[in-house]
Regions:
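Hydrophobic faces of well-ordered beta-strands that scaffold small-molecule active sites
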Residues: 23-27, 67-71, 108-112, 141-146, ...
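N-terminal pre-domain/capping segments
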Residues: 1-63, 67
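Active-site beta-loop-alpha junctions enriched in small/polar residues
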Residues: 30-32, 72-76, 113-117, 146-150, ...
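Histidine-acidic metal/acid-base catalytic patches
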Residues: 166, 177-291
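Active-site acidic/histidine proton-transfer and metal-coordination neighborhood
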Residues: 45-163
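Short helix-terminating capping/connector loops at secondary-structure junctions
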Residues: 18-20, 61-62, 103-107, 203-210, ...
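Well-ordered, non-membrane alpha-helical segments in soluble/globular domains
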Residues: 3-11, 46-53, 88-93, 125-132, ...
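Acidic/histidine-rich catalytic cores of soluble enzymes
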Residues: 125-207, 211
Length: 291
């Protein structure tokens, strides 16, 4: 069974991550192919794959990993079409059910974009807000919202996060190509506050709160500034981390680079070159930044 192989290989990847000090991981949303297809509505994949799901969840908990999903682009809560909204909610329920099958609490999040503007961004934003507010609590407590690179920018996404008490994942690359003149550091105090809400910290012990998360990537080329490069250029990320360090104890950085862990290893080598400039290497995938 493909789904069983996917879960087995996911466990192998997690072991690789732990061996390289990587504590943050995004699961593939395609772990169970066609899981939400109507023709398979009588199949319960979470029960059929109970043991491999549980094995993945057990490993995550044993090693204190922070995991997430990024449901596909067709999961759109700003849509004006009822059938698309229904499909989107079904997909979110599926992602929550996978976390539940792993035995993971609400610290495991589903990250989504606001979605399309459909020719009227204010109306689309209001529709998104209404649709999110109507979601079951089990879905809302696992949500994060991310600014995108073309439509809903960082200030607009942040306003929705604040209105709905949902944490915001700041994508600093998206913010660079889609902004209103603000800098990401200017928005950061408000973004940080979204990670202190009950939804953001659902499942977190009081003495070990879930840290905020950002996405980092670099432009593929001058002609394709929105595309992701193979690697992440160190200086823009380092400058941002320095700017938020005075008010930020911890932050998870999800790299979106074509070379995946290879990009991380290269970035850590680049970070090590700044050890005399306030960068302390903690392990193979973590740094401490002095303001």
């Amino acid at each position: 069974m493909i789904a069983g192989d996917n879960l087995h290989n996911t466990l192998r990847l997690l072991r690789h991550n732990v061996g390289n000090d990587i504590q943050v991981y995004r699961f593939s949303s395609k772990l169970i192919p066609l899981a939400t297809h109507e023709s398979l509505s009588d199949w319960n994949p979470y029960e059929a794959l109970r043991e491999p799901f549980a094995a993945v969840g057990k490993y995550v908990k044993e090693h204190g990993l922070r995991v997430s999903f990024h449901p596909d682009h067709f999961t759109v809560l700003s849509t004006p079409r009822p059938e698309v909204l229904k499909s989107s909610i079904r997909d979110l329920n599926h992602h929550v059910a996978m976390f539940d099958a792993m035995g993971l609490d609400a610290r495991a999040k589903n990250n989504i974009h606001v979605g399309g503007a459909y020719g009227d961004k204010p109306t689309a934003g209001a529709r998104f807000r209404e649709n999110v507010a109507a979601l079951p609590e089990r879905i809302k407590q696992r949500l994060t919202f991310e600014n995108d690179d073309k439509t809903f920018n960082a200030p607009e996404t942040l306003e929705l996060c604040e209105a709905l008490s949902i944490p915001m994942v700041l994508d600093i690359h998206h913010q660079w190509v889609n902004h209103e003149g603000e800098t990401p550091a200017e928005l950061w105090p408000r973004i940080l506050a979204t990670w202190q809400t009950p939804y953001a910290q659902a499942g977190s012990p009081a003495d070990d709160p879930l840290p905020p998360k950002i996405h980092a990537s670099s432009p593929k080329s001058a002609s394709d500034p929105r595309g992701h490069a193979d690697h992440v250029i160190v200086l823009p990320l380092l400058e941002f981390l320095r700017s938020i360090a005075p008010i930020t104890d911890r932050v998870d950085v999800m790299l979106e680079a074509k070379l995946k862990d290879g990009a991380l290893f290269a970035l850590m080598e680049d970070m090590a070159r700044y050890q005399e400039d306030g960068v302390e290497i903690l392990d193979g995938a973590s740094v401490r930044i002095k303001p």
